[in-house]
Amino acid sequence: APEFPPYIVPIRAGRKVPPFPEAGVIVVADSLLASRPELLDDIIAWGPQCALFDEAHRASTWAGKRATADRNLSLSVSGLSVPMTGTPFKANPVEVTNILALSGHLGPVFGGASEFIERYATKDRFGGWMPKRKMLPDLERQLTAHCWVRRNKQDVLKQLPPKLRTTRVVDIDRKGFAQAHEALYEKIGLWVDEMLENGVEITQEDIKVYAKTHIEIITPLRAAAGVAKIPAAIEIVKDWLQATTETGPDGSKVYTRPLVVWVHHSPVMEALKAAIPEDMAGIGFIDGGTPEHKRQPEADKLQNGEIGVIFCSIMAAGFGITLTRSSDVIFIETDWTPANISQAEDRVHRIGQTETCMITTLLAVDTLDAHMRAILRNKGKDLNVLMPGADNNVTVMTAHLNEAAGQYEILTQEDRELEKDFKSVPDIIERIVTEIVLKRTSLPRAA
């Protein structure tokens, strides 16, 4: 652990709390504040004059223990309370409510939590929060005028080279995806049959409730799409290594153009590890099973030229590590949240990068890939209003065959229909459930 001067006191999990300085700084994880109320009480009794909350978006759930502990600490300080984050919004205005409470602006500027939420958010047909799009420009104006000091990445890191995005459609063996599809339909069918056997006439409202409360059932279908893309991804990686690996003067391998490959689901990472040929050398992994203290050392193998490809989990390696020796990124899978994708991209596109970064997303037809991109486009549009100039358009292509004409992405009519119909995960589930119910009953189609 690093050494600190006596006036800086870090509090670490699993260790005895050291004496507080008469005057100085206490550094503590918000997870400890949430899990140890007596520690929070002791810090409040210490009488801090100001409080800084790093990564404040981690406490975006108003009633959560972390958010409640942060607010209690914020209310106790006599001076400034400053929340800091690069991602205040992930999808809707409700997520910033607690951050505004920490900064002291929620009441004076917006009249409190209830008034803020009523003004800027509404509930969708599944009961989830979504923005009132007409009010987003007003929210951005209020935040800029009264609440936040905000700088975009390109304004701060002007020396960074461009980050370009493109897609690549790959052929897949549909067997595994079809099996997951059938399993999903069978699971939903059991619910439908049970309802019908109990004499329940299934309404559209019943379907909405089911969709809202069973979001997890879509995960195996997403993972199956990722697994189905693995053979194509491995061929790409093999070709990449063959084209970019040279032999140095001492006979060692030199990886001239390292590659970062991202996945999201654990089953996809496990299937990837199992499918990689035994003779494929020069590769590394960072996933949920990699201890946090070993993640950057694993990344350093790529940074130091020891490996030519690293396979990473978005949630395990999408933040806090540096992979700037690479400027090429492939996503076998992505995420529902634009910020999680751009954070993963920025493991290569950050201070120290000197090359143009090329981000390639692998897509498979007749899977959920198109639906995911529709949802991401919708979220990106809202986030662009709230945070102009931020990196929210993770599906917008900036490298395309028509680049010379200034046309980076061609959206088909089908893409636009998907964007209209699918704004959240429950929308996808509702469509599937409705299809199954229609096959078993005479439920009228929704308008």
Give the location of each predicted region:
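Conserved helicase ATPase core of P-loop NTP-dependent helicases/translocases
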Residues: M280-A317
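Conserved helicase/translocase motor-coupling segment
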Residues: Q154-A275
